[in-house]
Amino acid sequence: MSSSESSSASGGGRPDAGQPPSEEQAMPRLDTLISHLVAAKRSLSSINHVWRANEIVTAARAALEECVVVSARTGFLRRGLNNQLRLLYSVRTEVEEISLRGRSEFAAVLKDLDDADTRLRRTLELLRETIVHPAFRPEGEDPKSLHDFVDERGVEELHAALKSSIDRTTAAQAQLDSSNHAFDDELLSIKEALGTYRTAAKLASSRSSSSASSSSASNSSLPSMSTMPSMLHSLEMHAQEMANLLESLVRHFDLCVTAVKHTEGGGAAAKSITGDMPVGVPVSGRMGSNIEDINDNLNAPLDPLSNSEYQEMVNVLFKDAAEAEDVVMEIQDRISEMESVLENVLAQRDALRSIYNATTDIYQHLSSLGSTRLPGYIAQAHNFTQVWHEENDRISGGLADLSDLNSLYDGFLDAYDGLIVEVARRKHVRQRVEKVLRDARHKLDQLYEEDVTARETFRVEKGDYLPSDIWPEIGREPMRIEFRRISGANVQAVNLQRPHEQEAITGEQEAANRLAPVESSDGDEIIPDLPRDLVEQAFARLKARVKGAT
């Protein structure tokens, strides 16, 4: 709009009557000027937009300052949180490794225990299934198995001790699992909080990206504030331009007031129209800020105008009136743009607030976790490790005891088979002895008969010629040989020692250790008569054990 203004006339009313008719006819009608004055007054309501523009600039500046502070705080907290989260997940990984390692070792030990117990039970079952041959036991006794000669109280006590160790380890493992599950719940809640944080960061970044020419801001964890200074500068430029546009509207209004007042009958109309001016609208260039200033401007005396000056003022007024509506629309467009920019600024501020709140929530959660519950999770892992080390030693000892018992009972089975083979061997030796005795008896009897016959022949042929006292034994019969069975002494160290060990024993020790043979009442050693197949089976089992051992 034009900024030219006409000087005021000293007197009101229409121009002089002596003017030429053509100029008088060119003068505008008062109602036309009044309509322009009313429109100009209406356009001054745009001052509300200017005030709003100032508020927007102030709010945007405050939001930018807050964003700088909040972003700095968030960045500081986030760097600390990253370190704490890495440490927290390292602790969780270590605790989980302790649990998995202990579980694996415990499972391996349990498998070894199961295998050893299975072997022991299988051996005990073989003892139950192996019936002692009746030939070994007194006549009339109920059948017995090898298991009847075993005291299982040691096995039961060992099982009870192992069960106690297993139960204690299982309880410690269950407590560790419960602790780890609670730890996982803590991590899950932290993940949820991190999800809230990421959502807020993504939203803020998307808004920042939409207002920027590049999308680099959307790739960062915190929204970029690089666009906010430019937006604030844009708001300031809009506000300044709106103030300039409002100033042009005020000048146009002043021009309308002056034109109406210089028109005959327009003074009262101008005063009536300008009686309720918006507060703060400057009139007649005096920048009045209240109604009293406006009234003073309206009551001020007018400077006289010539017809040409008046006509020039009216021409400027008409020209500006045609542009006033566009100026008002431009102010409205600018305030709409400023509102949109402010909304974007406040949205980024709110997003940063959300990120900061989410960050502080995570920080408080981590602080609470680190000061109260995390030491308990770590202590539970140490407790499990201590319990497992203690019980692992006990279980390893019990495993060795199970193996020893199994070896003992397996040796019992092997010894019983060896006993059967030994009985068969002794039976065979007895048979050989009997054969030797039979052969010897036959030869002795034969010699005896021959000797008796020879003595009788000698007595018949020579006896009558020899005096009886020449040899008293001449008429005696041959001696007779009798075999007597004597029970053997117990096989003691003397009989079992090696030759060089026997030589080291003194005569007294040898006399003490060697038990004298005891004559049995029945004169014979009882050797059980075992079936051939029983002996063969025992011998086959012994061979299988020897082969399996090699």
Curated annotation (Swiss-Prot):
Q: Taxonomically, which superkingdom?
A: Eukaryota
Region annotation (Disordered) ranges: 1-24, 204-226
Compartments, as annotated in UniProt: Cytoplasm; Preautophagosomal structure membrane
Regions annotated as coiled coil? 317-354, 427-451
GO MF, one annotated term: molecular adaptor activity
Stated membrane topology is: Peripheral membrane protein
Q: Which GO terms describe its biological process?
A: autophagosome assembly; autophagy of mitochondrion; piecemeal microautophagy of the nucleus
Keyword annotations from UniProtKB, A to Z: Autophagy, Coiled coil, Cytoplasm, Membrane
Pfam families named among the record's database cross-references: ATG17_like
UniProt GO cellular component terms:
Atg1/ULK1 kinase complex; phagophore assembly site membrane
Q: Locate the transmembrane regions by residue number.
A: none
Q: Which InterPro entries match?
A: Atg17, ATG17-like_dom
Known role? Autophagy-specific protein that functions in response to autophagy-inducing signals as a scaffold to recruit other ATG proteins to organize pre-autophagosomal structure (PAS) formation. Modulates the timing and magnitude of the autophagy response, such as the size of the sequestering vesicles. Plays particularly a role in pexophagy and nucleophagy.
Give the UniProt family note: Belongs to the ATG17 family.
Name of the featured protein:
Autophagy-related protein 17
Classification lineage: Eukaryota, Fungi, Dikarya, Ascomycota, Pezizomycotina
